[in-house]
């Protein structure tokens, strides 16, 4: 067991792996990471699946079966991804049971092409939930304006949700409201809300990539001094919002009925700038009740040389506010930054989804011949 990762878990940060593949499942690697790297959750996305399915032979048998049945490419994608997610859910079921449903969660994303279609997103979430048929599943729904009512409706039906692609503080506040509204509707319908869970995936490194590009164009010493500070400041203030919202009477009523809080999940935590410490977005975002989902390279880096100095979020709220104020003074429009990132985030997942469809369409053709 890695001491840095054990220490991170002890500090209240749930360690999740941002990756999945059939090879990782079948070789026992995921189970090994659960044993030796404190991994208690898994996130996936269309990009991860496209790379996994296009890069190995472990899917060939299922592809042949699907080709023989003559299924269309959409059904094939759902069958293949659901099989991997179901197996990962089973591997992490002990963590789910041990934590009373808090951890041991595995996330599967709805078709990203539906990011701006509320009703179709809800229908897709329901279909994926039934297809995987595991209580420790999270359905990933993007935090677009159309996604917010879909999040509420999905939670109201008793389906656990990972809200993804959150960049803006005001959007995060809307996400928490959508979460509570969904639980209130579920409770009114007589559901046991203790079984309905959620995380809010707040993206980190992409904020620095966008802001640092704008700072480079400004080019002043003050702008240079603010490089690689925006993302951490933004995330820290998100946690402050989390503390505020989940101490309100509204939340206390839900908690009394058995609800679990919607934990902040730090996503996009690998550093894009090679000049930065490779564990930066882990070390600087430590606080109780959070999740950090890491690609394997970041996970192994933290296992090797990560440091847990204690809570690195709550003592730094004023510094975080100062960073965002200085960015505004320099002319960096954070509202525009987060809007650009949301549009790009949806587009990137749509592109990966289309590549995934192309990959499976090609492999179905090869398997049938």
Swiss-Prot record:
InterPro entries xrefs: Aldolase_TIM, TAL/FSA, Transaldolase_2, Transaldolase_AS
Family per similarity comment: Belongs to the transaldolase family. Type 2 subfamily.
GO terms for MF: transaldolase activity
Superkingdom, natural source: Bacteria
Localization per Swiss-Prot or TrEMBL: Cytoplasm
Primary gene name: tal
This protein's UniProt keywords: Cytoplasm, Pentose shunt, Schiff base, Transferase
Name of this chain's protein: Transaldolase
Active site annotation, chain numbering: 140
Pathway assigned to this chain's UniProt record: Carbohydrate degradation; pentose phosphate pathway; D-glyceraldehyde 3-phosphate and beta-D-fructose 6-phosphate from D-ribose 5-phosphate and D-xylulose 5-phosphate (non-oxidative stage): step 2/3
Species this chain originates from: Parafrankia sp. (strain EAN1pec)
Swiss-Prot/TrEMBL catalytic activity: D-sedoheptulose 7-phosphate + D-glyceraldehyde 3-phosphate = D-erythrose 4-phosphate + beta-D-fructose 6-phosphate
